[in-house]
Amino acid sequence: YEIMPSLVGSEMCIRDSIMTELAQMFELQQSATFFGSWGGLALALLGAGLAAVLSGIGSAKGTGMAGEAGAGLLCQDPGKFGKVMILQVIPGTQGLYGLVVWFFAIFRMGLLSGSLPELTIAQGFQYLAACLPMALGGLFSAIAQGRVAAGSINILAKKPDDWSKGMVLCITVEFYAILSLLASMLMIINISA
């Protein structure tokens, strides 16, 4: 009877050892997958890229709309080029803000150090979420600002002395792009390393 308890204990020890080995192999296999190894970095880069790309798309569309309206006016009155140019450039600031968020995010990730950082999935999602305000805010505010700038060019065409009122209207939309920039920057600053 005394030998049996020791055999049962040995079997339990072997079983625990096998289970531990299997668990370690599973963890190793899971960490070797793309998402396990690089998922956090991939999510973070996706967020940073979206901030730059979507803001840039919005700025391109916004400045394009304002440029189309400005081209019509400049055919009739080339002397208004300076004022038209100012109104056309205003929707382009969101692209710049998106690039600032992209640069700040990759700086905080540690990508500028020369080596690839190891970010957890949670950190990757934090970067993605932090970059979304600028990505979406930049996209939609730049398009809206382009429409306002195009309308302001119509003000310049009909009442040249009142063109500054159109600038004030454009700056009102700019305020929300600045809020998007601020939200993204504050969120990125608070991501733990």
Locate each region found by the language model.
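Single conserved hydrophobic/aromatic residue that forms the stacking wall/gate
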Residues: Y1-D16
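Hydrophobic, small-residue-rich transmembrane alpha-helices and their short perimembrane loops
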Residues: I18-A193
